[in-house]
């Protein structure tokens, strides 16, 4: 889809479909009023008949209005004045896209810039709008014998006042990069596990480096992981025929002496639970257990597209967790790269076992910040549901920055504590630490486990178990989160 920004009067624009907003109580914004005047009150007449109440997301298509170059006018309800928030604005945008998809026109122009969205300026409104539209165009039908019909719509133009055009352009540019990153994340998450395994992800990284020249990729194999002393990482992979990989991504958009930000992604390409086997019902969704790593891919794609002036490192800890005669057993003790020993009480608490070695590996980059992203605990879904990611960290300023980024990007997180009392749940009589802390506060104790390997830098942990994918039903699939949050965090660091 091509997105453009133009500063023209809506009544003079030649387009297949002109989109205008109408509030409840027949409220017309400046753009709708201009078109209404040009058509001799055609819009007002329709509203007086009660064909459109103006509730958020209601649509009404008008054909061939007089004195317009637009072939059609699509009216969309914007709700009550001064009550339009992010959620309602996204609903409005989705309703517009749903209608446009069913039309024959190859282009459309959206005159929505005069809508007041609470707490959002022209830049933020444009970004929210374009991101919603672009993400709404996503289709995954790679393995369908009957593909989706090609979309007739090829171009969307945002109409903006001249004073706002630069801000709208920038918002649109950022949104397209974020949406492209989300699409990559969703594609990788939605792939079947017989295709998407650790070696495949290494090849995908190399492919991304070919697309963007500023990206360097190194793929560490099983031999190298053993040389590094990553006993915890290797323990997760030892039951599978698929070899593990630590994928290292490096982008240098700033001066070489500027410390990088590091993103660490959990990449369990399929999680059976290992010897601590999961129930069969819903196990197919454990292909999404690599969505942390997929979100690092997606965030890198967005950063590379925007060419942000920052230095960024990605560490993707990729393995498959399978039961076999050679698999790790409950009760096994392994030595991590840090030298700390871990008693593995449950092989289904494997994400933290690959992440801990990756977090130790991150030390060599002398980072400004390290953020790990993982579909780590079912307890996070119990605590926060599927709307909000869990967030913990050892530096309050970093945590606040991520919370702020999530609010702006409409990809929110919520902070959970890492009090010392929770650390005691991880005590082991046989090793330095146990990999689970009992039934209470499971998300927090998982964060406590990771914190033991992140003491040499500012670190935060995002638990995306509830937000990375949608379970069951027709909408089942990866969401692309938290690419918007992470990209916004890096945009702010690049200023």
Swiss-Prot record:
UniProt-listed GO biological process terms? proteolysis; RNA metabolic process
Q: What is this protein called?
A: Cytosol aminopeptidase
Q: Which GO terms describe its molecular function?
A: aminopeptidase activity; manganese ion binding; metalloaminopeptidase activity
Gene name on record? pepA
Key word Cell wall biogenesis/degradation present: no
What reaction does this catalyse? Release of an N-terminal amino acid, Xaa-|-Yaa-, in which Xaa is preferably Leu, but may be other amino acids including Pro although not Arg or Lys, and Yaa may be Pro. Amino acid amides and methyl esters are also readily hydrolyzed, but rates on arylamides are exceedingly low; Release of an N-terminal amino acid, preferentially leucine, but not glutamic or aspartic acids
Enumerate the UniProt keywords alphabetically: Aminopeptidase, Cytoplasm, Hydrolase, Manganese, Metal-binding, Protease
The record's annotation in SUPFAM superfamilies points to: Macro domain-like (SSF52949), Zn-dependent exopeptidases (SSF53187)
């Amino acid at each position: 889809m091509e997105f453009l920004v133009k500063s023209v009067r809506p009544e003079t624009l030649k387009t297949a479909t002109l989109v205008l907003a109408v509030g409840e109580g027949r409220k017309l914004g400046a753009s709708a009023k201009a078109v209404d005047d040009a058509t001799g009150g055609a819009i007002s007449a329709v509203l007086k008949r009660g064909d459109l109440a103006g509730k958020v997301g209601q649509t009404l298509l008008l054909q061939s209005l007089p004195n317009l170059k637009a072939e059609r006018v699509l009216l969309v309800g914007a709700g009550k004045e001064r009550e339009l928030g992010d959620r309602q604005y996204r609903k409005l945008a989705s309703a517009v896209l749903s209608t446009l998809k069913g039309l024959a026109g190859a282009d459309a122009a959206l005159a929505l810039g005069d809508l007041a969205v609470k707490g959002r300026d022209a830049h933020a409104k444009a970004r929210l709008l374009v991101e919603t539209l672009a993400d709404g165009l996503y289709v995954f039908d790679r393995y369908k014998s009957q593909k989706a019909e090609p979309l007739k719509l090829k171009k969307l133009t945002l109409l903006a006042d001249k004073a706002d055009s630069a801000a709208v352009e920038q918002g649109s540019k950022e949104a397209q990069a974020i949406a492209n990153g989300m699409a990559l994340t969703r594609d990788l998450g939605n792939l079947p596990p017989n295709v998407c395994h650790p070696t495949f992800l290494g090849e995908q990284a190399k492919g991304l480096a070919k697309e963007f020249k500023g990206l360097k990729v190194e793929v560490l194999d099983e031999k190298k992981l053993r040389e590094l002393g990553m006993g915890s990482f290797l323990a997760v992979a030892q039951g599978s025929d698929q070899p593990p990989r630590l994928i290292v991504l490096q982008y240098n958009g700033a001066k070489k002496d500027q410390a990088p930000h590091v993103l660490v992604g959990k990449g369990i390409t399929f999680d059976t639970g290992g010897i601590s086997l999961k129930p069969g019902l819903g196990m197919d969704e454990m292909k999404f257990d690599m969505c942390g790593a997929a979100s690092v891919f997606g965030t890198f794609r967005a950063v590379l597209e925007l060419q942000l002036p920052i230095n960024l490192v990605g560490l993707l800890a990729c393995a498959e967790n399978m039961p076999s005669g050679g698999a790790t057993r409950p009760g096994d003790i392994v030595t991590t790269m840090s030298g700390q020993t871990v008693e593995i009480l449950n092989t289904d608490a494997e994400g933290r076992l690959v992440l801990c070695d990756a977090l130790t590996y991150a030390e060599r980059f002398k980072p400004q910040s390290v953020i790990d992203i993982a579909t780590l605990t079912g307890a996070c879904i119990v605590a926060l549901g599927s709307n909000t990611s869990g967030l913990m960290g050892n530096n309050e300023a970093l945590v606040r920055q991520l919370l702020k980024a999530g609010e702006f990007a409409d990809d929110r997180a919520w902070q959970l504590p890492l009090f010392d009392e929770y650390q005691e749940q991880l005590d082991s009589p046989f090793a330095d630490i146990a990999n689970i802390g009992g039934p209470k506060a499971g998300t927090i104790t998982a964060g406590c486990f990771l914190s033991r390997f992140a003491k040499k830098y500012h670190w935060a942990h995002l638990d995306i178990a509830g937000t990375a994918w949608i379970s069951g039903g027709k909408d089942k699939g990866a969401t692309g989160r938290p690419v918007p949050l992470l990209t916004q965090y890096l945009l702010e660091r690049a200023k």
